[in-house]
C-alpha cells in the first residue's frame, strides 16, 4: 500500500467493501452498458481530466499497456494474477477500454484494482527489462502526491500534486514515508516519541503497545481488516507420485483427506485462546477465510472448541 499516494487503480474498495471509481469515470453495470449479459465483457469508461505527474494525459493506451506489461512472464509482475482469465484488453476510444474474459467472471473488478503505470515511461522496459526502468526509483503516477525523493529501504518524500483530479484533496502539502528498521522501532517513533504521525499494520505484541501508550504521545487505533492468518494443510499425498510429482492435486492424503479428521482438527482449535494470548486486542477469532467487512463474515460456519466431541 506504500505506493497508494502516488499510483492509482481504476477502482478501489471502500471501508464497506464496495467498489468505487478512482481513475474510472463510473462503475460498469448492466444498466449503463458496461457489463455484457454473458458475464464475459466489461467496458470501462475513464476520467478525461487525469494527468500523469509529468503532465502527459492518462488514456486508454495506458490501461491496455498495463495488462500487456503485467502478463508478460519475463516481467514476473506480482500483479499478473489479477489478470487471470482475461482474454484481451482492447482500446475502444481514447478513454474507453473493453476487457474480454475467457469465461463468465464475477470478480471482474480485480484487474481494475491494479495501480496504473504510464505507457510512455515503461514501454521501453517490457519483460525482463522491467527491472532496469529508471522510473522504478522515481515512479510517475496519477495520485495526490508526486515523488520528489526516493531512497530505497529508507525514505520516500512526496509533494502535493497541483493537478490532482479529485477536488479538495489531499489535505497535507508534504508526505514523508519512512522505511527500514523494525516494527517495534516504528511503533516507538509514533506512539512514544511522536516523531511520525502514523504507523500502519504494526506487528508488535499487544503488551508492548500498551506500555508505549501509557507514557507516550500517541495512541493505538485498532481497525479490523479483511485478511486472515491461518494454517493450511496439504490434502494431497506426499508419498505418492502422480505425473512425475509428489503431493499432486490428483492424489489424496491417507489421513487429511478424511472429512472426519478435518472436523476433529477444527474442534481442537482454541481460537479464543489464540486471540487472547497471541494477538490481544488486535485479533478477531473467526472460522472464516474472509472476516471483514461484516456483511461478508458468515455466521453459519462452526467454530466450536471441544476436545471431548465425537465426529
Please report, for each region that a protein language model flagged, where it lies by residue.
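Aromatic- and charge-enriched surface segment that lines or borders ligand/interaction sites
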Residues: 26-76, 92, 98, 186-192, ...
Amino acid at each position: 500500500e506504500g505506493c497508494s499516494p502516488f499510483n492509482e487503480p481504476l477502482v478501489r474498495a471502500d471501508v464497506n467493501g464496495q467498489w468505487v471509481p478512482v481513475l474510472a469515470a463510473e462503475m460498469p453495470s448492466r444498466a449503463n452498458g458496461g457489463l455484457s449479459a454473458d458475464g464475459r465483457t466489461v467496458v470501462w469508461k475513464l476520467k478525461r481530466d487525469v494527468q500523469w505527474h509529468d503532465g502527459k494525459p492518462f488514456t486508454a493506451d495506458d490501461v491496455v499497456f498495463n495488462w500487456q506489461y503485467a502478463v508478460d512472464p519475463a516481467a514476473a509482475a506480482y500483479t499478473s494474477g489479477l489478470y487471470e482469465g482475461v482474454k484481451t484488453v482492447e482500446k475502444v476510444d481514447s478513454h474507453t477500454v473493453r476487457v474480454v474474459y475467457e469465461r463468465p467472471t464475477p470478480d471482474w473488478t480485480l484487474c481494475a484494482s491494479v495501480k496504473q503505470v504510464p505507457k510512455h515511461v515503461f514501454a521501453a522496459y517490457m519483460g525482463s527489462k522491467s527491472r532496469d526502468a529508471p522510473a522504478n526509483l522515481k515512479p510517475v503516477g496519477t495520485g495526490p502526491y508526486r515523488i520528489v525523493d526516493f531512497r530505497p529501504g529508507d525514505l520516500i518524500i512526496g509533494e502535493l500534486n497541483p493537478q490532482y483530479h479529485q477536488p479538495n484533496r489531499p489535505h497535507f502539502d508534504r508526505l514523508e514515508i519512512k522505511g527500514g528498521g523494525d516494527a517495534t522501532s516504528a511503533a516507538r517513533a509514533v506512539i512514544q516519541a511522536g516523531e511520525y504521525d502514523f504507523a500502519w499494520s504494526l506487528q508488535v505484541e499487544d503488551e508492548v503497545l500498551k506500555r508505549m501508550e501509557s507514557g507516550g504521545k500517541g495512541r493505538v487505533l485498532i481497525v479490523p481488516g479483511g485478511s486472515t492468518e491461518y494454517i493450511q494443510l496439504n490434502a494431497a499425498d506426499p508419498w505418492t507420485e502422480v505425473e512425475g510429482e509428489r503431493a499432486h492435486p490428483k492424489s489424496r492424503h491417507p489421513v487429511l483427506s478424511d472429512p472426519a479428521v478435518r472436523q476433529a482438527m477444527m474442534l481442537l482449535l482454541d481460537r479464543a485462546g489464540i486471540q487472547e494470548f497471541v494477538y490481544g486486542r488486535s485479533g478477531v477469532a473467526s472460522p472464516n477465510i474472509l472476516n471483514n467487512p461484516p456483511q461478508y463474515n458468515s455466521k453459519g460456519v462452526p467454530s466450536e472448541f471441544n476436545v471431548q466431541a465425537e465426529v
